[in-house]
Amino acid sequence: MAQPVPRLSIPAALALGSAALGAAFATGLLLGKRWPPWGSRRQERLLPPEDNPLWQYLLSRSMREHPALRSLRLLTLEQPQGDSMMTCEQAQLLANLARLIKAKKALDLGTFTGYSALALALALPEAGRVVTCEVDAEPPKLGRPMWKQAEVEQKIDLRLQPALQTLDELLAAGEAGTFDIAVVDADKENCTAYYERCLQLLRPGGVLAVLRVLWRGEVLQPQPRNKTVECVRNLNERILRDARVYISLLPLDDGLSLAFKI
């Protein structure tokens, strides 16, 4: 019998397998039915108990995490608010999508410690580029050594300024329609503006991913209790009705929306 795989000790590997992509989708669909996205912090992230046999099986049969990614994830989880980082399942799914569409240019809104930027950079070719946006200069310092360790530091363009400013600069520089994938995990008050600008920057066939679109289940409230919940709900409605994209909303972690530009 296989030994349990602790959530924070997932085997690392570099290879890409089509089964991993399917497992990521299946994991979200299964966990979304069994564990609601509210309550304790673990429940908020749609995670079952670490000793759950089915969860162990899913992790052990799907996760292929680069050593530098694993190291950065473990370091991040030791930091204040470290659990606000994208989960390894989400990172692997987005990296696999980037590989699937042969992405060369990526946007990453909300660098934090650089885990998502690293995952994307590893999925891009040697000449690939990840533009990652962060307003706080401190968290990315944790990730820089791992970017270097993974030999992708040259692919990552860190912009320490408001994400909207970076997006507007890219549009002004004539880069509309040139990006392949965009990941939005930044403040929710500007999420609609991020969505619209990223959509302009993406090429047809590009992928736009928005994280935390269930917001701990508060999107179910009849009346949003704050501006953040209202913004998330408004964005979800906008994406649903947007004829410019094909969509999927997955119950991975606190909700992951995927919009595929037509």
Swiss-Prot record:
Enzyme Commission code(s) on record: 2.1.1.-
Top-level taxon of the source organism: Eukaryota
Compartments, as annotated in UniProt: Membrane
Keywords: Membrane, Methyltransferase, S-adenosyl-L-methionine, Signal-anchor, Transferase, Transmembrane, Transmembrane helix
Bilayer disposition of the protein: Single-pass type II membrane protein
Molecular-function annotations in GO: O-methyltransferase activity
Record-linked Gene3D superfamilies: Vaccinia Virus protein VP39
Pfam families associated with the record: Methyltransf_3
CDD domains: AdoMet_MTases (cd02440)
Cited InterPro entries: Cation-dep_OMT, SAM-dependent_MTases_sf, SAM_O-MeTrfase
Coiled-coil segments: none
Gene Ontology annotations for the cellular component aspect, listed alphabetically: membrane; mitochondrion
Residues in the signal sequence: none
Record: residues binding S-adenosyl-L-methionine: 108, 110-111, 116, 134-135, 163, 185, 187, 194
A Gene Ontology BP annotation from the UniProt entry: methylation
Chain ranges passing through the membrane: 12-32
Protein family (similarity comment): Belongs to the class I-like SAM-binding methyltransferase superfamily. Cation-dependent O-methyltransferase family.
Function as written in the Swiss-Prot or TrEMBL entry: Putative O-methyltransferase.
Assembly: Homodimer.
Protein name (database record): Catechol O-methyltransferase domain-containing protein 1
Organism per entry: Mus musculus
Gene: Comtd1
